[in-house]
Amino acid sequence: MAQAEAVQGKIVQCIGAVVDVEFPRDKMPKIYDALKFEGSALTLEVQQQLGDGVVRTIALGSSDGLRRGLIVTNTQAPITVPVGKATLGRIMDVLGAPIDERGPVDQTLTASIHRKAPAYDELSPSQDLLETGIKVIDLVCPFAKGGKVGLFGGAGVGKTVNMMELINNIAKAHSGLSVFAGVGERTREGNDFYHEMADSGVVNLEKLENSKVAMVYGQMNEPPGNRLRVALTGLTIAESFRDEGRDVLFFVDNIYRYTLAGTEVSALLGRMPSAVGYQPTLAEEMGRLQERITSTKVGSITSIQAVYVPADDLTDPSPATTFAHLDSTVVLSRDIASLGIYPAVDPLDSTSRQLDPNVVGQEHYNVARAVQGTLQRYKELRDIIAILGMDELAPEDKLAVARARKIQRFLSQPFHVAEVFTGSPGKYVPLSETIRGFKMIVNGEADHLPEQAFYMVGTIDEAFEKAKKVA
């Protein structure tokens, strides 16, 4: 097939990250077409057609040095990024260019970052549980293989640490591949993650093709266009592995920054903001991303997404829009973190559609509901205790409070990724042990133990051992 004739235009206006480019009227670029400059790595993505041959674009990179009259070439295709084995063990930016100083990425296989979600008849829902080794998650909000999970939390309650522990427990034991998309987060965290993966062998620095993870970063210091599109770049790589018939883990840190980048781009394009200043297309943008993160009859994508909650307000439009797309929600609470209980997961706020007796089994379901019931009773009694003290409670309420406090402490657990800070070795607790431990507490088999014996231990047997030392 003959090469399409190159269509060129020139810049007519440049305001920050927004660049207007004029083309011949009969050769206007399509929405999402990528435009390139000669001798520069900068790419523009078409967002609007203004008429009279002028298109409005967003710069995916710094627009410093751009001026009116510069010649721009239309690639006549959306942004494409390298996919497949060549991406394993590599760190790339939004355009698929390497940023790990380990040479170019093989471009033999490439794919457009914009594509339709799989058709309804191609989807394959899964009922299999994904064991994480984290007690509170496995008990009250279990993950589904091929499902979508959100880690919700305000600033500094442990979203990234929880995400790193999940990567540590799942990705290392997981025989498939992982893709990590760093969307608008700290560069330091991205760097730490890379070195952690290299130390654990998930990234094989000697033979990169034997690595099990691909990394795509568009960090906080980058222009909004990069932060908006980097999630799609990571997703495109994950989709290509899924379409090869593999089971893929897709980690996103942080979905809120994706929304925020969309807000910035929307404002730059002159759209009227909607509630709380967000873009009017918030639900559509979120849906377009989330609908592509799905499992088909060929392979699966299990996605774990950190979601920042501004001002700890879960009703904010950004986290509220994300909720609708998830199978499991893990809500991190500042109140629980302030008690020194980590992971600071709120067992009463976190949900999972997997917590169903037909999926997890009757025993698991009963224990989880009994744990939640005991904690809920403690929550209701807290005001009475604060005013009148423990002595005024009925004997059965005193017992419920004692058990709830033990459950609360038993929900804490030392993490592998936090060993450096805590000094205590991380614990991986199998699901069967988690159920056995909580069942014993709920049934009163651990009533004689002091509550500090349950703090920061793995299994219930460790709590019994610790009680002997405490005594």
From Swiss-Prot:
It comes from the Bacteria. It catalyses: ATP + H2O + 4 H(+)(in) = ADP + phosphate + 5 H(+)(out). InterPro entries: AAA+_ATPase, ATP-synt_VA_C, ATP_synth_F1_bsu, ATPase_a/bsu_AS, ATPase_alpha/beta_chains, ATPase_F1/V1/A1_a/bsu_N, ATPase_F1/V1/A1_a/bsu_N_sf, ATPase_F1/V1/A1_a/bsu_nucl-bd. SUPFAM superfamilies: C-terminal domain of alpha and beta subunits of F1 ATP synthase, N-terminal domain of alpha and beta subunits of F1 ATP synthase, P-loop containing nucleoside triphosphate hydrolases. It is found in: Cell inner membrane. One of its GO terms (cellular component) is proton-transporting ATP synthase complex. It is a peripheral membrane protein. SMART domains: AAA. Its EC number is 7.1.2.2. It holds the Pfam family ATP-synt_ab. GO terms for molecular function: ATP binding; ATP hydrolysis activity; proton-transporting ATP synthase activity, rotational mechanism. Keywords: ATP synthesis, ATP-binding, Cell inner membrane, Cell membrane, CF(1), Hydrogen ion transport, Ion transport, Membrane, Nucleotide-binding, Translocase, Transport. F-type ATPases have 2 components, CF(1) - the catalytic core - and CF(0) - the membrane proton channel. CF(1) has five subunits: alpha(3), beta(3), gamma(1), delta(1), epsilon(1). CF(0) has three main subunits: a(1), b(2) and c(9-12). The alpha and beta chains form an alternating ring which encloses part of the gamma chain. CF(1) is attached to CF(0) by a central stalk formed by the gamma and epsilon chains, while a peripheral stalk is formed by the delta and b chains. PANTHER family: ATP SYNTHASE, ATP SYNTHASE SUBUNIT BETA, MITOCHONDRIAL. Belongs to the ATPase alpha/beta chains family. HAMAP family: ATP_synth_beta_bact. Produces ATP from ADP in the presence of a proton gradient across the membrane. The catalytic sites are hosted primarily by the beta subunits. This is ATP synthase subunit beta. The lineage of its organism: Bacteria, Pseudomonadati, Pseudomonadota, Betaproteobacteria, Burkholderiales.
